[in-house]
Every structure is written in C-alpha cells, then in structure tokens.
C-alpha cells in the first residue's frame, strides 16, 4: 500500500542519516494553564506590583509567553464564536490583574449580561459588577465622570505627565463580556468613555471587550470599536467563520480549536 511504501522509504532514509535525526518540530500544546506559562517567565516578571507584563497566552512562533505591557498599552478587544474562549479569556485577565496589582492599585468594573463572570472578580478588587443594561448606563456615566477628574489640566507640568503623579488612586479595568448585548439600540454604556480612550494611559483606564464573531465586520464600524481600531489597539481573533470578512486591521477569522487565536498587533502584525 501507499502508507507501507512511505513508511519503508522513511525508515531507509533514517538508516542512512549520518548526523542522526534532526530536532523534532515543537508545536503548540492542545491545552496549557496559566501556571504552565508563569513557570517560563523570568523571576522579575512573576510578582511585580503596579502593573507590568500581563500574560495573554503562549506564542506559536517561539512557544514562549505572549505578554501585554499594561504600562504602555491600555486596551484589548477580542472576537470569537460561542464556546471558543471569550469568557475564559476575561477570567485569565482577572487572574493577571490580581497578580500584577494589589487591591489598592487596581479596581475592576465588569459588565456581564449573561453573568458568566459571576464570582470571578475577588470582592476586594470589585468596583462594580453590572448585569443589566439600565444599571450599566448609569454606572458607566458615573465612572466616566470620575475618570475625567484625572485628565491633566493646564497646571500639570510635563514632568508630572511623564511620571503620571498628578492624581492618585487605583487604575480602573473595565471588562465587557458579550459586547453585542451591551451596545444595543437602547444605547451603549461605553459611549461615555469614548473620548477618554485615547488618553487612557494618562488616567489609569483600561477597557477590554469581548464580542461574538457573528456580525463582527459590521460591528467594527460602531464608534467604540472603531476608536479601538483607530488607536491600533491589540486585537484578538478566536475561531470564527472566514466568510465574516476582514475584522481587525484587514485580518479575517479562521476556524481553529477553542483557545487558539490570531493576535493582531500594531507593530508585530499577526
């Protein structure tokens, strides 16, 4: 048979190799835990406080940790089909926030219409946990009003801006699961943050959005997601139908196993 012939040929080639077999190709594991990736990090990355390198996953090209620097980058957005890892991604983000920050250094506001993150945010880190649209509109308006008090005024010196020490308090992480259930015809709570997104690094604001893949290419014209794209925010594409078309920076989704993703970075590409 063909398979027997191929096996015979491979064995003959192996017998005549002078230098022995070459190194085996390393592939991404089917499953990996956050603890597995943490074990690969240098010691100085393990327990920093006040932000730093957040683990997003394992990078395929070098099979090393894929990191997100919270001191230089503020936001993330992710698209994926059902049961491909959207909520698990947010749970990992929550775990990383609690690793990188103390409760005095960071607070989390979660907008979670399906209650998928119920119990995931430690109480000492929770600023708000919102599960309905009306509360989300009200709470986000209040949060945005407070964050505007951190915007640098004319009296703030260039040195203060470099050191970001004209305000004090925790950084705010706004985590939004199922964004398609949040941004509706009844309004979008995140519109209150729209003008703050470009200045987020100055005021300690982080916004992380997950959304289903269906209709993603159309959704990117929605104002908040469009701002994310304009700011060249790192985007993540989990498994999805390629027919959806270009979603992030011209990149189309593709079918893959749960947890496997394309990461679109402004400098590194895909």
Language model regions located:
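P-loop NTPase catalytic phosphate-binding loop
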Residues: 44-233, 240
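Phosphate-binding and hydrolysis-coupling loops of NTP-dependent motor/remodeling domains
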Residues: 1-60, 65-66, 210-211, 217-270
């Amino acid at each position: 048979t063909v398979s027997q012939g191929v096996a015979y040929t491979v064995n003959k080639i192996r017998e005549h190799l002078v230098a022995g077999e070459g190194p085996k190709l390393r592939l991404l594991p089917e499953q990996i835990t956050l603890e597995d990736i943490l074990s690969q990090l240098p010691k100085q990355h393990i327990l920093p406080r006040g932000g730093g390198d957040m683990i997003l996953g394992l990078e395929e090209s070098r099979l090393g940790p894929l990191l997100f620097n919270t001191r230089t980058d503020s936001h993330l957005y992710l698209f994926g089909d059902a049961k491909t890892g959207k909520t698990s991604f947010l749970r990992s983000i929550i775990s990383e926030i609690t690793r990188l920050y103390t409760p005095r250094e960071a607070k989390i506001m979660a907008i979670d219409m399906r209650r998928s993150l119920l119990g995931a945010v430690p109480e000492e880190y929770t600023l708000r946990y919102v599960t309905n649209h009306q509360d989300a509109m009200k709470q986000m308006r209040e949060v945005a009003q407070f964050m505007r008090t951190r915007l640098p005024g004319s009296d703030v010196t260039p040195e203060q801006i470099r050191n970001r020490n004209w305000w004090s308090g925790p950084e705010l992480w706004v985590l939004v699961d199922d964004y398609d259930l949040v941004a509706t015809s009844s309004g979008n709570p995140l519109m209150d943050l729209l003008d703050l997104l470009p200045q987020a690094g100055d005021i300690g604001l982080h916004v992380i959005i997950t959304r289903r893949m269906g209709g993603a290419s159309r959704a990117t014209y929605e104002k908040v997601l469009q701002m994310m794209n304009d700011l060249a925010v790192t985007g993540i594409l989990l498994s999805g139908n390629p027919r959806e078309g270009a979603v992030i920076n011209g990149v189309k989704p593709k079918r893959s196993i749960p947890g496997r993703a394309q990461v679109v970075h402004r400098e590194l590409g895909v």
